[in-house]
Amino acid sequence: MNLLIMGLPGAGKGTQAAKIVEEFGVAHISTGDMFRAAMANQTEMGRLAKSYIDKGELVPDEVTNGIVKERLAEDDIAEKGFLLDGYPRTIEQAHALDATLEELGLRLDGVINIKVDPSCLVERLSGRIINRKTGETFHKVFNPPVDYKEEDYYQREDDKPETVKRRLDVNMAQGEPILEHYRKLDLVTDIEGNQEITDVFADVEKALLELK
């Protein structure tokens, strides 16, 4: 089974990806892990990626696409299938993935899209606060400190509501064309992500069992 998982930051995509891998035994292919492995193994694309990263530059699409292709060509993929997580990030990468899969004789079986209302995600992501003295992390709503005093806590710039909203807007602008592309191919299953983790996975599992 060859899968792609999508969802906005904070939607719980990583949690569900781990559960899918555990339950279905597919190879988990996350962008970060792929880059680290390619650089550690000094593959052709890994060396290229490292040359950009060492200079503090963005890795071009053709290198990222090349690293994905190297990983998808490995033996375990044909045997176990895969779950792509964090790629493609742009419609151009989605088209490159289509070409790679065709070249390798593989096909995508389904796209799981974890949907959560953006306003809920802003609350989830912007509630994180850090204790100035201990460095402990809490959440204003989901894990509040017992003795909360505003002056004892601070919030990282990345966690402020306006920053979170901007990040979500960018992700939505990039993600929508990708989802639309896969919807036209009748590959997308939308999963309601604003429920308990176990309930989300029950819906994911049901959708995947129907694909088998």
Curated annotation (Swiss-Prot):
Example GO BP: AMP salvage
EC number: 2.7.4.3
Region (LID): 127-159
Matches recorded under Pfam families: ADK (PF00406)
UniProt catalytic activity: AMP + ATP = 2 ADP
Location of the protein in the cell: Cytoplasm
Residues covered by region (NMP): 30-59
Domain of life per record: Bacteria
Binding residues for AMP: 31, 36, 57-59, 86-89, 93, 156, 167
GO cellular component: cytoplasm
Keywords annotated in UniProt: ATP-binding, Cytoplasm, Kinase, Nucleotide biosynthesis, Nucleotide-binding, Transferase
Residue numbers binding ATP: 10-15, 128, 137-138, 195
Enzyme class: transferase
Pathway: Purine metabolism; AMP biosynthesis via salvage pathway; AMP from ADP: step 1/1
GO-annotated molecular function: adenylate kinase activity; ATP binding
Free-text comment about domains: Consists of three domains, a large central CORE domain and two small peripheral domains, NMPbind and LID, which undergo movements during catalysis. The LID domain closes over the site of phosphoryl transfer upon ATP binding. Assembling and dissambling the active center during each catalytic cycle provides an effective means to prevent ATP hydrolysis.
Subunit-structure text: Monomer.
Role: Catalyzes the reversible transfer of the terminal phosphate group between ATP and AMP. Plays an important role in cellular energy homeostasis and in adenine nucleotide metabolism.
Similarity-based family: Belongs to the adenylate kinase family.
Protein's name in the database: Adenylate kinase
